[in-house]
């Protein structure tokens, strides 16, 4: 065991000497490699969907996809619109404009329903009549009152399209099951001759690829943009439903990642400053862990792995875990400098004494984190895989980039 340790110390001493000798090449290659990986971060996707918590081969996900193929999406976007006088010409005209604006300008809509295109089913004698509720748009007070009576007396509308007190009405939007991206324009010459109730896309013209979380966010953002044009004191619009909730969670995730990173950098930087009382003692470890985090996230994006709720802790976690190795090296290096050693010798001695401990600590940490890759919940498995990879990337830059920068 002693011989092994002595050989390891010699190996780390020689390795540090080699890095110091070719430090400019090492720094250049490290920067190029990190930039190549980090350049993919712009393609990193945030996934807040329920399906994102399941593995691609999970039987539950397979069953759910079969359900969506047959019955469509089971989550809706709901607009609740408040007014003291819903059955007024001004309100109904604005509701119609909102309905048509959403229908014509927003992508990925499969179906939508409101008072504007609702079906009216009623019996007259022995005859069952089915037509549009607003087949004839009301223009007089008498027609408006008749419409109000029909709507408020119909149990199929109550708490569906109109509240019991008549102060709220809804506009329900169902997005496509399949993505519209990349669809061939095979059906562009055919137009739907049906009424407004059916004048929507045919479930995305089944491309075989389910609508993505990114397209869901674009869909929700487009709805918010249109709603903003109609929002007023006498036309108050509230948005609810799973797509809106998932979009809000995504925004919170993006905000939280940035916030946690800033807090982690400030806290770690402050601790390093108190510990070393040197600018280099603060800047160099932060450079190493920042490059490691950027490379890890870039690798995630390159491999097409989405950022999910549990993985939001990954950047901050890697910052906290990765900085420890740099602290060991810097502490021993500065001790050597205080004893009067030359910088190159102090760096080599630091790696000779701490190199094996740093490697073993990183390996055991990575192995422990990798055990999460066996988890049944996909984001937990992703967290285990990429946190272990991130620890090893951090180790690599600690052994190569850090001594090159120190020299």
Task: State what each model feature region is.
Residues 61-64, 92-99, 220, 224, ...:
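Extracytoplasmic/secreted envelope proteins and their assembly/folding machinery
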Residues 55, 62, 72-76, 107, 109-207, 248-251, ...:
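Extracytoplasmic
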Residues 1-48, 178, 208-407:
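Membrane-embedded transmembrane helical bundles of large multi-pass transporters/channels
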Residues 76-80, 113, 170-174, 238-240, ...:
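Soluble periplasmic/extracytoplasmic beta-strand elements of cell-envelope proteins
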Residues 41-86, 92, 138-161:
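Solvent-exposed, non-transmembrane loop/terminal regulatory segments of multi-pass membrane proteins
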Residues 54, 81-90, 173-181, 203-214, ...:
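Structural beta->alpha junctions
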Residues 80-82, 96-122:
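Short amphipathic beta-strand/extended segments in non-transmembrane regions
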């Amino acid at each position: 065991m002693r011989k092994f340790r002595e050989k390891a110390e010699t190996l780390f001493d020689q390795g540090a000497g080699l890095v110091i000798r070719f430090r400019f090449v090492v720094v250049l290659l490290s920067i190029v490699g990190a930039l190549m990986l980090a350049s993919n971060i712009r393609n990193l996707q945030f996934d807040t969907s329920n399906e994102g918590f399941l593995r691609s081969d999970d039987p539950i996900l397979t069953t759910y996809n079969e359900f969506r193929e047959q019955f469509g999406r089971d989550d809706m976007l709901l607009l609740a619109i408040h007014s003291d006088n819903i059955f007024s010409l001004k309100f109904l005209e604005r509701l119609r404009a909102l309905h048509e604006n959403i229908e014509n300008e927003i992508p990925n809509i499969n179906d939508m329903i409101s008072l504007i295109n609702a079906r009216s089913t009623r019996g007259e004698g022995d005859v069952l009549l089915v037509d549009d509720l607003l087949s004839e748009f009301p223009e007089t007070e008498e027609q408006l009152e008749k419409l109000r009576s029909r709507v408020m007396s119909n149990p199929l509308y109550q708490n569906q399209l109109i509240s019991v007190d008549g102060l709220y009405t809804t506009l329900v939007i169902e997005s496509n099951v399949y993505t519209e991206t990349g669809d061939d324009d095979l059906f562009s010459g055919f137009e739907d001759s049906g009424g407004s109730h059916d004048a929507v896309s045919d479930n995305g013209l089944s491309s075989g690829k389910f609508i993505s979380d990114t397209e869901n966010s674009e869909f929700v953002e487009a709805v918010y943009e249109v709603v903003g044009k109609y929002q007023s004191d006498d036309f108050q619009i509230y948005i609810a439903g799973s797509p809106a909730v998932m979009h809000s969670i995504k925004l919170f995730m993006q905000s939280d990642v940035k916030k946690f990173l800033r807090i982690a950098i400030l806290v770690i930087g402050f601790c390093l400053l108190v510990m070393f009382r040197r600018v280099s003692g603060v800047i160099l470890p932060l450079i190493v862990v920042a490059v490691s985090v950027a490379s890890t996230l870039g690798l995630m994006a390159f491999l097409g792995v989405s950022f999910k709720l549990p993985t939001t802790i990954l950047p901050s976690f890697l910052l906290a875990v990765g900085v420890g190795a740099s602290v060991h090296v810097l502490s021993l290096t500065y001790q050597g400098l205080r004893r009067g050693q030359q910088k190159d010798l102090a760096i080599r001695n630091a790696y000779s004494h701490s190199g094996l401990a740093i490697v073993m600590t990183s390996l055991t940490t990575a192995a422990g984190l990798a055990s999460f890759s066996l988890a049944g919940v996909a984001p937990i498995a992703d967290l285990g895989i990429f946190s272990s990879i991130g620890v090893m990337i951090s180790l690599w830059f600690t052994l190569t980039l850090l001594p090159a920068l120190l020299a």
